[in-house]
């Protein structure tokens, strides 16, 4: 009688291939959103059939990236500041937490309208948008932030700024671990520059130590 074929090594190999394809897709699509699946397969070091075995088409690959981004975002949000933290510190904390997530998945921003659809990206970002709006509302009540704009409107403006900064990272015009972005966000929210820098210098080291897992 023949022995059953061991499946565990095959499953591990399949998981490894899938993870490598996704990591390659993040990198290559960030460089060129028009990269083809065939080009991604070559860059990942797998044959075309292996890639299509995991992802039957471009839409399936992008949806897998979107789901991965959503999971990483939720995990990062679990490290958000405590509710009692002053709003300026909470906003700096949150910006620093989100920066590496945005940096890793910034290619989704370029693909949002054409491939994923604005609604899918909005679904992924909904928890982060709600958190920032809540911080701004609390800061306005506490007199930390001015009330020149409704919190939801200001939140949208700050998000657009982060997207613009990430695009500059994508082009190589900006190098940032999130510190400069956090200062810019606080200033845009109405915090004086000197105080914004002091807040980020205070909050930054502990938050930056919580890096995303390596690729």
Model-derived segments and spans:
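Short linear capping/connector segments at secondary-structure termini
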Residues: 110-119, 201-202
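Hydrophobic alpha-helical connector segments
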Residues: 64, 71, 75-105, 117-120
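Alpha-helical DNA-contacting segments of helix-turn-helix folds
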Residues: 55, 60-69
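Amphipathic alpha-helical packing segments from all-alpha helical-bundle domains
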Residues: 68, 116-167
